[in-house]
Amino acid sequence: VRSRGLGDVYKRQMGIYDRLHQILPGHPAKLFLLIGVNDISHDLAPDSIVDMIRMTVERIRKESPDTKLYLQSLLPFNESFGRYKKLTGKTDMVPEINSRLEAFAKEEGIAYINLFPLFTEKGTNVLRSELTGDGLHLNEDGYKIWVKAIKKKI
């Protein structure tokens, strides 16, 4: 298991695309993709974000066709922490993107893991404050929920 969490390396999800050459020659049995939320803070439209994820999936399938893909929904974030100003007012973009990702996964026969509802405050699109320390990244309790959800799918 290797994590390629890149944070703001390229400030765009295409940074992952550009680094696939580090992963794909090993023809991994499985890849879990949880990408796109950083792009929201860079003012990319939902269509652009989904298109970049689609390009990433196409490249993985071309260069490592036997790799089983798991496309995870974007996680919610919580603006009340005030740390990520560029996400302000954009909470409702996440379910919109997730809806498009789920449709894409269904069209392409890719396993889709809908994590979003596991992490939101009831009746909102906001990340539960007890699952984060900064409003964006999961804390230990958040990771426990994530791991449990992933294990159910594999």
Q: Would you name each region that the model predicts?
A:
Residues 1-10:
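Single conserved hydrophobic/aromatic residue that forms the stacking wall/gate
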Residues 7-8, 34-37, 72-75, 115-117:
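Active-site-proximal beta-strand/loop segments in catalytic clefts of secreted hydrolases
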Residues 8, 38-46, 87-88, 132-136:
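Second-shell loop/turn segments in exported
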Residues 14-50, 74-79:
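Oxyanion-hole/transition-state-stabilizing segment in secreted/luminal serine hydrolases
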Residues 32-34, 58, 70:
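Conserved, well-ordered alpha-helix/loop/beta-strand core segments that scaffold catalytic motifs
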Residues 46-56, 94-97:
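Charged helix-capping and loop-helix junction motifs
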Residues 64-68:
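A short helix->loop->beta-strand "cap" motif at the edges of active sites that frequently abuts
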Residues 76-154:
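Catalytic His-Asp segment of secreted/periplasmic serine-dependent ester chemistry enzymes
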